[in-house]
């Protein structure tokens, strides 16, 4: 059985009992980041003392985007042997801007059973923090790195707003690039409301709200989720 397991997006106290039970019951954990996976298992042992791995041979296997195609046949073989395999990303829900799509696509084709163990996402958390109406929203993944691609996407979103004025957009951006993105946005002639959500659920969580033009000179570090209306 394959389990797609969400993990905390920053605060390990958000770890659920169901997530913990699933992981310690696994034969194999496919981890985008093995170091994060080991930290997570240590957190489970501290927070859920009655839970112990069902096997001392629990494997943690590195499974990141660039290696997904290469490792897929072995994972499918494990599943057909009846192994319990859990997929986790570094944080949040796998497949959402994280590895796992090829695996899920293949198990559906092969009629191998799988289920999702849900949990927090930076997307929904940021939308609530933003204070913006969320009747309709679209998630864009990571914003483009190249200036030309940024400008092209900003113009596309601006056009979408003409047809769907209530739509809000959510995307990930790095602290190193966010200022450039905001300045390009301000220069596009579109000055929307937005929220910049930094280090969500962590000790130094910070939410900045305002117009794009009001936030272009701020300095940001860490992991950033942006909500734009």
Q: How should each PLM-predicted stretch be described?
A:
Residues 1-65:
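Glycine-rich, flexible N-terminal cofactor/catalytic loop recognition
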Residues 102-160:
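Class I SAM-dependent methyltransferase SAM-binding "motif I" and its flanking Rossmann-like core
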Residues 35-37, 92-93, 122, 177:
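Alpha-helix capping/helix-boundary segments
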Residues 9-12, 90-94, 175-177, 202:
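Short glycine-rich anion-binding loops that position phosphate/pyrophosphate groups of nucleotides
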Residues 2, 162-229:
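A contiguous loop/helix-start segment that scaffolds small-molecule binding in enzyme catalytic cores
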Residues 64-121:
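Glycine/small-residue-rich loop that forms an oxyanion/phosphate-binding "nest" at active or ligand-binding sites
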């Amino acid at each position: 059985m394959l389990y797609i397991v969400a993990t905390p997006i920053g605060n390990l106290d958000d770890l659920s009992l169901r997530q913990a039970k699933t992981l310690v019951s696994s034969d194999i954990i496919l981890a985008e980041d093995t170091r994060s996976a080991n930290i997570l298992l240590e957190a489970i042992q501290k927070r859920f003392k009655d839970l112990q791995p069902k096997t001392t041979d629990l494997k943690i296997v590195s499974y990141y985007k660039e290696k997904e195609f290469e490792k897929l046949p072995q994972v499918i073989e494990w599943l057909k042997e009846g192994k319990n395999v859990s997929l986790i990303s570094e944080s949040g829900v796998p497949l959402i801007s994280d590895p796992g799509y090829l695996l899920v696509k293949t198990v559906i084709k092969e009629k191998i059973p799988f289920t999702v163990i849900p949990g927090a996402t930076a997307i929904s958390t940021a939308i609530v923090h933003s204070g913006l109406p969320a009747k309709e929203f679209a998630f864009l993944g990571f914003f483009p790195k190249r200036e030309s691609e940024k400008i092209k996407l900003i113009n596309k979103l601006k056009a979408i707003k003409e047809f769907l004025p209530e739509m809000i957009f959510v995307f990930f951006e790095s602290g190193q690039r966010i200022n450039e993105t905001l300045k390009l946005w301000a220069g596009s002639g579109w000055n929307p409301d937005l929220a910049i959500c930094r280090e969500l659920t962590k000790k130094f969580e910070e939410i900045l709200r305002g117009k794009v033009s009001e936030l272009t000179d701020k300095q940001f570090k860490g992991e950033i989720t942006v909500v734009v209306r």
